Structures are given as C-alpha cells and as structure tokens.
Amino acid sequence: MKKQNNLRSLAAQAVELVVEQGQSLSNVLPPLQQKVADKDKALLQELCFGVLRTLSQLEWLINKLMSRPMTGKQRTVHYLIMVGFYQLLYTRVPPHAALAETVEGAVSIKRPQLKGLINGVLRQFQRQQETLLNEFATSDARFLHPGWLVKRLQNAYPTQWQRIIEANNQRPPMWLRVNRTHHTRDGWLGLLEDAGMKGYPHPDYPDAVRLETPAPVHALPGFAEGWVTVQDASAQGCAVFLAPQNGEHILDLCAAPGGKTTHILEVAPEADVLAVDIDEQRLSRVYDNLKRLGMKATVKQGDGRYPAQWCGEQQFDRILLDAPCSATGVIRRHPDIKWLRRDRDIAELAQLQAEILDAVWPRLKPGGTLVYATCSVLPEENRDQIKAFLQRTPDAALSETGTPDQPGQQNLPGGEEGDGFFYAKLIKK
C-alpha cells in the first residue's frame, strides 16, 4: 500500500529543488512519484511540468497578490501557492478541490499555520483573475522564458523568435523509432492500429512515427521486445546523416542514454560501435537500452576532450558527436531547462564543444564522416561553432548540410514536428 501524500506539496517541493537548488526535474521527480499511488503519478507529473512551463506567470501573480515573498523555511509555501494558481488556470481539477488540496498541502510541509494565508491568496486570485490576466498579457513575463533567453532568440531569429517561444511553451508530441531489424515502419503501424492506437510516419526520417495521442510505453506493441523506442524525430536525424555501414568502426561520443547508439546498430547491425559518455550514472541507461534491444556495443566512461584515455590511438570510420549543449531546442520536453540555464553558460558550452571537436577530429580516418549535433537553437553552439571549426581545420569539409556561410541544418521546434536540433556533416579530406 502506497503512502497517501499530498500531491500539491510534493509538486511544490519538486519545483523548489529545481529553481532554488538547480536540480533537474528528471532526477527530482522519480523518487517523489514513488511516494504516491499509481493513479496519482500522472497528475503529480503534470503539476511539476506545468508549473515549470508557466513559472514566469505564476511568479508574476504572486508578486501582484503578496506584499512580500515567502523566504527561508517558508519558501516551499511560495511554490505551493504557484501549484494552486496552476491548477486554477490550466487544469480540469474543480476549483474547490484545487483550493482545498493546496491549502491542505501546508500541513504536509509542516506549515499548518499558513493555511489561512494560502487560502486567502488563492481566493483573491479567483476574484481578480480577469483583471490580472489582462495585465499579465502585456507584461515582459508573458513569454514564459527568462529575459536573457528571449533576447538571444530575438537576436538569432528576428522573424521567428516568437514562433520558437510559442513552440517551447507547448506540450511535446510523442515520437517513436521503429526498429527496422524487426519490422518495417508500415508493418509496425499496422500493429499499432490493431492495438487501438494511431500513428503518423515522418516524411524525412524513415523510422519515425508520431503517436496521435501519447501513451505509456507498456501499451506499445513489442516495446519490451525491442520493436520500438521512444525517441524524438529530430534526434533520429543523427543516424540518418551519419549513414553507418556494417563492418565500420563507429564512435558515438556523449552517448547516454543510448538512443542514438541503438539507432546506429539498427541501421548497421554489424558495425563495431564504441559508446562513450562522461557521466557514469547515465551510462547505466545505455546498458539498459542495449539489453532491451538485444544489441552489443562497447560502452566506456570518458571525457570527450581526452580520447587517448578511452580509446588509445584507435581511429574510426564515422563519429557521432552529440555535443553537450544548452538544450534550448528541447524546452517543451524539459521546461526546467529555462530555469537551470544561465546566460553565461552559453560561452562556456561553446568552448567545451570546440575542445571536444578539436580532440576527436584526429581520431577520424581520412575519408571518414563526423556528424556534429546539438539539441540547441543558439547559433553560438551551432553554425558559429562549425564555421569556426572549418576555418581552423584545413582537412575538414562540409557535406550535405548547409553552405560554408550557413553551415549545418537547423531544425526549429514546433507543432507536431520534432524538437529543435542542429546537425553538421563533416568529411575528412
């Protein structure tokens, strides 16, 4: 029997850990979900994701309705009130239930003396909702993004920045990758239809299927048997551009959690793949994915800047570098990114990307292919990065993706399409 915890207080604690301590929601949420009944896990997730998606608005409302912020040991109450606002604005939870459960959350976080305050603020919001929302619609907070990121997007995409922001604020579609070693995409779509679900093929990525309605993985035909994997359509572009062949030595660098490693092996089952990532904990997910799909690869922990430590003098026919980045292309999937990143991070990430590129390029055989990929939409990490690399690397040439002036292919997030993603395909002369 699961403990019956107050969902609203758990959501408030999760958001506080993300915003105040810089922890990622993917690390914070699973242990909290263990504290609630199975039937409540989806609502807990919705409250956490929703509050982080709309955090700017909820913060703005608190500042309008409270004379001073909650601080110190009372800080969790600040986020509990946000959870209350979110329910009233964006969920189908009946207002009386949202109010009662949120107020009761004060008991769970050992602040029962603040129940009256929480109740008062939420009721005041209900009374003034229309006026407040009209005022909010003209405020700087309306974009639901930190100001530094709005400025960067405006500079990079003068005519498209609002579309990018709108896409980031949407719920993401659920994309799958059909394992071509088991089924054709059309064949698996037939199995999906037999299971009472509908999916749509992607026009450019041959294994990609978008579910009409997101579903739990255990409901997908053959998921446990490795027939299908959850992976965004744009991420599937990496293996498409890499075009791995059987018998080749292939390096998948920054490989965790293993989605691209396994895609490479689906396309070229007899390739010799080395998957490397700096994060030992995340490598466990690479092993899990390989096991579920019945595949084999060499998996090593290592820093991409120092290849001698993990591959000696070995050279590769193809290298996929899915570089560490700001993840500004996947905000709709991970809304905590907006609050975990800082403006100063971008220059640091660009420097790290350049160091890894320079370190692994000598490990590519002449005539070999390196695909540089990020899930960022910022030019400093993408086109500017590749332009600078081509200028300082005489034996590197761009292939298929873009022009020397505008190197690479930049996918922007949006609608039912894939996430924001960048690829540059480079050939060693």
From Swiss-Prot:
<dbReference type="InterPro" id="IPR004573">
    <property type="entry name" value="rRNA_ssu_MeTfrase_B"/>
</dbReference>
<dbReference type="Pfam" id="PF01189">
    <property type="entry name" value="Methyltr_RsmB-F"/>
</dbReference>
<keyword id="KW-0694">RNA-binding</keyword>
<protein>
    <recommendedName>
        <fullName>Ribosomal RNA small subunit methyltransferase B</fullName>
        <ecNumber>2.1.1.176</ecNumber>
    </recommendedName>
</protein>
<keyword id="KW-0949">S-adenosyl-L-methionine</keyword>
<dbReference type="GO" id="GO:0005829">
    <property type="term" value="C:cytosol"/>
</dbReference>
<dbReference type="InterPro" id="IPR018314">
    <property type="entry name" value="RsmB/NOL1/NOP2-like_CS"/>
</dbReference>
<keyword id="KW-0963">Cytoplasm</keyword>
<feature type="region of interest" description="Disordered">
    <location>
        <begin position="397"/>
        <end position="419"/>
    </location>
</feature>
<dbReference type="InterPro" id="IPR023267">
    <property type="entry name" value="RCMT"/>
</dbReference>
<feature type="binding site">
    <location>
        <position position="277"/>
    </location>
    <ligand>
        <name>S-adenosyl-L-methionine</name>
    </ligand>
</feature>
<dbReference type="GO" id="GO:0006355">
    <property type="term" value="P:regulation of DNA-templated transcription"/>
</dbReference>
<dbReference type="GO" id="GO:0003723">
    <property type="term" value="F:RNA binding"/>
</dbReference>
<dbReference type="GO" id="GO:0009383">
    <property type="term" value="F:rRNA (cytosine-C5-)-methyltransferase activity"/>
</dbReference>
<dbReference type="InterPro" id="IPR023541">
    <property type="entry name" value="rRNA_ssu_MeTfrase_B_ent"/>
</dbReference>
<dbReference type="InterPro" id="IPR006027">
    <property type="entry name" value="NusB_RsmB_TIM44"/>
</dbReference>
<dbReference type="InterPro" id="IPR035926">
    <property type="entry name" value="NusB-like_sf"/>
</dbReference>
<comment type="function">
    <text>Specifically methylates the cytosine at position 967 (m5C967) of 16S rRNA.</text>
</comment>
<feature type="binding site">
    <location>
        <begin position="254"/>
        <end position="260"/>
    </location>
    <ligand>
        <name>S-adenosyl-L-methionine</name>
    </ligand>
</feature>
<feature type="binding site">
    <location>
        <position position="322"/>
    </location>
    <ligand>
        <name>S-adenosyl-L-methionine</name>
    </ligand>
</feature>
<dbReference type="GO" id="GO:0070475">
    <property type="term" value="P:rRNA base methylation"/>
</dbReference>
<comment type="similarity">
    <text>Belongs to the class I-like SAM-binding methyltransferase superfamily. RsmB/NOP family.</text>
</comment>
<dbReference type="InterPro" id="IPR049560">
    <property type="entry name" value="MeTrfase_RsmB-F_NOP2_cat"/>
</dbReference>
<feature type="binding site">
    <location>
        <position position="303"/>
    </location>
    <ligand>
        <name>S-adenosyl-L-methionine</name>
    </ligand>
</feature>
<feature type="active site" description="Nucleophile">
    <location>
        <position position="375"/>
    </location>
</feature>
<feature type="compositionally biased region" description="Polar residues">
    <location>
        <begin position="400"/>
        <end position="412"/>
    </location>
</feature>
<keyword id="KW-0698">rRNA processing</keyword>
<dbReference type="Pfam" id="PF22458">
    <property type="entry name" value="RsmF-B_ferredox"/>
</dbReference>
<keyword id="KW-0489">Methyltransferase</keyword>
<dbReference type="InterPro" id="IPR054728">
    <property type="entry name" value="RsmB-like_ferredoxin"/>
</dbReference>
<dbReference type="InterPro" id="IPR001678">
    <property type="entry name" value="MeTrfase_RsmB-F_NOP2_dom"/>
</dbReference>
<dbReference type="Pfam" id="PF01029">
    <property type="entry name" value="NusB"/>
</dbReference>
<dbReference type="InterPro" id="IPR048019">
    <property type="entry name" value="RsmB-like_N"/>
</dbReference>
<keyword id="KW-0808">Transferase</keyword>
<dbReference type="InterPro" id="IPR029063">
    <property type="entry name" value="SAM-dependent_MTases_sf"/>
</dbReference>
